[in-house]
């Protein structure tokens, strides 16, 4: 039984869905991974997975280019003849599902991690695109043999309000999960007089709260606190809310933050951190950086926003602050800096929660259950 996993980058497939692909393969499925080419396709192939390149521009709205993409998908699905296509992100859900319906693929699963720029932004381009994307999503997500996987209850309500979710066809599954054997608490070598370290790991978008993070760092430094503020991630020039690289380098030049760029081994990086923050005011699905940090037993600070509040319960396994409030963020960081007991308690609780809810084995099992609902085993 052949299934296709379709995503907009090979980076996504490798970092978030390789465990699912390997588990499906071990369970007897024939798995084909589909994405544009990138730096991670060789890694997928080295794992013994089958991967195929598909040329697509995840930011394009050119009608001719998009029609070519749709036709490529239809031809590929007709040639490969999968019984199920599993699409990730909004654009892949739209084109993958429409192509699958044309190619008469019997089952379609669309995993959408938040509503994305078109629905969350209020700029002119987003407002113009919204009716078209909504109409395309209605076509893509409808029909027999379709399931929608969402990551949090807020998104479910939003999809229902937009008329995009039908009762009985939505599954709530918490993201891709995390490998809790790899992301786990590690012993740290004691370093005399080493300043505590705070980390923000995210795509470098304004919506992720970068400006608030930098301002919180300024506030705490003005109080005479010796703290290292680290930023991990690369700029995303194609995104309308991307922070310019020149701005990031200016923050570094001012001595406010240290910019690490892309970090491949996040588990090792977390092992040297004291606090992890994500001051996002973006509608997250479920923030992977928070789940990974929680699995490592680190105390978390994030905002009271959809997706974020599913990972952190205030005072129980982390701290929540209002979005776009740099002073509240600074106060929460200061509170954790001043109490090793609180950091330890919240970190331990965060790890316990991840083991119970976000372990990738739980997520993979639930995903396979959705597969079996659509395509019962012979």
Labelled PLM ranges:
Residues 313-315, 319-326, 335-341:
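Conserved acidic donor-binding segment of nucleotide-sugar-dependent glycosyltransferases
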Residues 35-39, 201, 228-243:
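Glycosyltransferase donor-sugar binding loop
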Residues 233, 242-263:
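Nucleotide-activated donor-binding/catalytic signature segment of Leloir-type glycosyltransferases, i.e.
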Residues 14-19, 196, 200, 205-219, ...:
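A conserved mid-protein helix/loop that constitutes part of the nucleotide-sugar donor-binding site
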Residues 299-302, 312:
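Short hydrophobic beta-strand element within catalytic cores of glycosyltransferases
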Residues 271-285, 298:
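Acidic donor-binding loop of glycosyltransferase active sites
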Residues 116, 154-155, 172-184, 203-206, ...:
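Short beta-strand->alpha-helix junction loop in the catalytic core
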Residues 52-55, 130-186, 197:
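Donor nucleotide-sugar binding/catalytic pocket of nucleotide-sugar-dependent glycosyltransferases
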């Amino acid at each position: 039984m052949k299934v296709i996993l379709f995503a907009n980058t090979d980076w996504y497939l490798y970092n978030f869905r390789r465990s699912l692909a390997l588990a499906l393969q071990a369970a007897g499925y024939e798995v084909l991974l589909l994405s544009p080419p990138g730096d991670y396709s060789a890694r997928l192939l080295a794992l013994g997975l089958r991967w195929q390149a598909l040329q697509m521009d995840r930011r394009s709205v050119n009608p001719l280019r998009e029609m070519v993409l749709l036709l490529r998908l239809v031809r590929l699905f007709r040639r490969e003849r999968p019984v199920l296509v599993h699409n990730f992100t909004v654009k892949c859900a739209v084109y993958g599902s429409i192509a699958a319906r044309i190619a008469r693929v019997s089952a379609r699963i669309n995993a959408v991690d938040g509503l994305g720029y078109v629905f969350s932004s209020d700029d002119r381009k987003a407002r113009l695109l919204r009716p078209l994307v909504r109409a395309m999503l209605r076509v893509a997500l409808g029909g027999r043999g379709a399931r929608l996987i969402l990551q949090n209850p807020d998104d479910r309500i939003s999809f229902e309000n937009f008329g995009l979710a039908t009762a009985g066809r939505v599954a709530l599954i918490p993201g891709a999960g995390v490998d809790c054997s790899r992301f786990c608490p590690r012993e740290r070598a004691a370093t005399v007089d080493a300043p505590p370290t705070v980390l923000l790991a995210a795509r470098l978008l304004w919506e992720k709260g970068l400006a608030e993070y930098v301002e919180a760092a300024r506030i705490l430094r003005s109080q005479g606190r010796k703290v290292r503020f680290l930023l991990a991630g690369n700029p995303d020039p194609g995104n309308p809310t991307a922070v310019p690289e020149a701005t990031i380098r200016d923050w570094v030049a001012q001595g406010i933050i240290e910019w690490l760029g892309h970090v491949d081994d996040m588990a090792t990086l977390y092992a040297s951190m004291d606090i992890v923050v994500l001051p996002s005011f973006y509608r997250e699905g479920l923030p992977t950086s928070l789940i990974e940090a929680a699995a490592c037993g680190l105390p978390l600070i994030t905002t009271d926003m959809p997706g974020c509040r599913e990972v952190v319960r205030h005072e129980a396994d982390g701290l929540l602050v209002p979005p776009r409030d740099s002073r509240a963020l600074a106060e929460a960081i200061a509170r954790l800096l001043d109490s090793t007991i609180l950091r330890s308690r919240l970190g331990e609780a965060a790890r316990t929660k991840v083991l119970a809810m976000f372990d990738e084995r739980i997520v993979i099992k639930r995903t396979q259950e959705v597969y079996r609902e659509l395509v019962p085993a012979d």
